[in-house]
Amino acid sequence: MSEPTGVIHDIGYQRYTGPRLGRRAVFGALYVHGVRTAFGLGRSAKAKIFPWLVVGIVLMVAGAVTAIGSQIGETLMTYAQFADSMSWLVIFFVAVAAPELVSRDLRSGVLPLYFSRPLPTADYPMAKLLALATALWMLLGAPQLVMFLGAAFTGNDMGAVWDELLDLLPGLLYAGLWAVVFAAVGLLIAALTGKRAFAAGGIVAVFLMTTPIVGVLSILPSQAANQLAGIASPSTLVQGIGIWTMRDQLITDPDALGPDLGAFGPVYALVAALLVAACVALLLARYRKVAAR
């Protein structure tokens, strides 16, 4: 009878005896990891190229606006106008970041590992949604802070700094509105497929292909249809809320009329709230289905 040839090696594994962190710690870890992932941090150099290219563009635009404005003594662009003008970049940022946040985990099949921990099914998508919204708000808010610092340091007194601060706060709130709406829509689309290319294409299609619908509605022979046209696209929906709440911040040219919302400003806000709520509800339903597999 041959002797057994197997050898047992003690490689030093030990049972974990530290504190067991609960739901809040897991949620926080997912959130922080999601924000880092959106900007390519902790990933390969290739994954960092596009996010930081977008960051570089928005910061360069903010720096140029600040420098030119200080030279000519005029405000080239308000903080709210900056968020509007960068919205097209935000679309592509969402199209890249959202699939990285959720599609990769769906395709690799690691979600059962997440849900085996003390993490309710709803916490995973909510942490990802909050992370994406934070990343988008930082993307639009950080350049506004650059513009604010440039204007504050070129001001004559503290009164000018205070005026700039009062202009900055609505701009940051407006950036937050962009972030919440775009994150909710983008993450829902990305969560529908495990293939990142399909998710990215779907996000771009939803945001860009709804714009022609707005154009068609705006030329119909109906004043109500014209005034409500903006609700057909996420981008113009957010812009409509901005026009309703801070028209003087977005339309600074006295000769420019801007979109006419009539008395439908509150309708835009209601539709945006319902859109975000619907996206969140569908996102939670999607992950309940995934967890039940």
PLM regions: where:
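Hydrophobic alpha-helical transmembrane segments of multi-pass membrane transport/permease proteins
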Residues: 45-67, 88-94, 203-210, 274-277
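Helix-loop-helix units of permease transmembrane domains in multi-pass membrane transporters
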Residues: 101-134
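Secretory targeting signals
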Residues: 126-127, 131-193
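Terminal transmembrane helical anchor/hairpin motif
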Residues: 197-291
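Alpha-helical transmembrane segments of multipass membrane proteins
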Residues: 57-61, 135, 139, 143, ...
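Aromatic- and glycine-rich beta-strand/loop motifs that create alpha-glucan
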Residues: 2-49, 285
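Membrane-embedded or membrane-proximal helical elements that form or frame transporter/channel pores
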Residues: 63-98, 103-104, 249-271
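Cytoplasmic membrane-interface segments at the C-terminal ends of transmembrane helices
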Residues: 100, 104-112, 184-197, 280-293
